[in-house]
C-alpha cells in the first residue's frame, strides 16, 4: 500500500508534479515513491 501524499521535499514534490500533477498535495502518480 503506497502513500499517495507527496513528501515535504521540494525535489520530490516537483518530481510528482512533473510526472502527472497533484491535487491538494496528493500525488496522483501511483508510481511516485515520495
UniProtKB/Swiss-Prot annotation:
InterPro entries named in the record: Scorpion_toxin-like_sf, Scorpion_toxinS_K_inh
Question: Which keywords accompany this UniProt record?
Answer: Disulfide bond, G-protein coupled receptor impairing toxin, Secreted, Toxin
Ranges in coiled-coil conformation: none
- A single Gene Ontology molecular function, please? toxin activity
**Intrachain disulfide bonds:** 6-27, 12-32, 16-34
Q: Mind telling me which Pfam families this protein's record contains?
A: Toxin_2 (PF00451)
| Location relative to the cell | Secreted
Q: Is Secreted among the key words of this record? A: yes
User: What does the record say about tissue specificity?
Assistant: Expressed by the venom gland.
Q: Which domain of life is it from?
A: Eukaryota
> Remarks, anything else?
Negative results: does not show activity when tested at 100 uM on mammalian sodium channels (Nav1.1, Nav1.2, Nav1.3, Nav1.4, Nav1.5, Nav1.6, Nav1.7, and Nav1.8), potassium channels (Kv1.1, Kv1.2, Kv1.3, Kv1.4, Kv1.5, Kv1.6, Kv2.1, Kv3.1, Kv4.3, Kv7.1, Kv7.3, Kv10.1, Kv11.1(hERG), GIRK1), a calcium channel (Cav3.3), and nicotinic acetylcholine receceptors alpha1-beta-1-gamma-delta and nAChR alpha-7. The letter 'N' in the name stands for the Greek letter 'nu' that has been chosen as the activity descriptor for melanocortin receptor modulators. Since it is impossible to search for Greek letters in databases, the UniProt policy is to write all Greek letters as their full names (i.e. alpha, beta, etc.).
- Record note on domains: Has the structural arrangement of an alpha-helix connected to antiparallel beta-sheets by disulfide bonds.
Q: What is this protein called?
A: NU-buthitoxin-Ptr1a
Which species?
Parabuthus transvaalicus (Transvaal thick-tailed scorpion)
Amino acid at each position: 500500500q503506497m502513500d499517495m501524499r507527496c513528501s515535504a521535499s521540494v525535489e520530490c514534490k516537483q518530481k510528482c508534479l512533473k510526472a502527472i500533477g497533484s491535487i491538494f498535495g496528493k500525488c496522483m502518480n501511483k508510481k511516485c515513491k515520495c
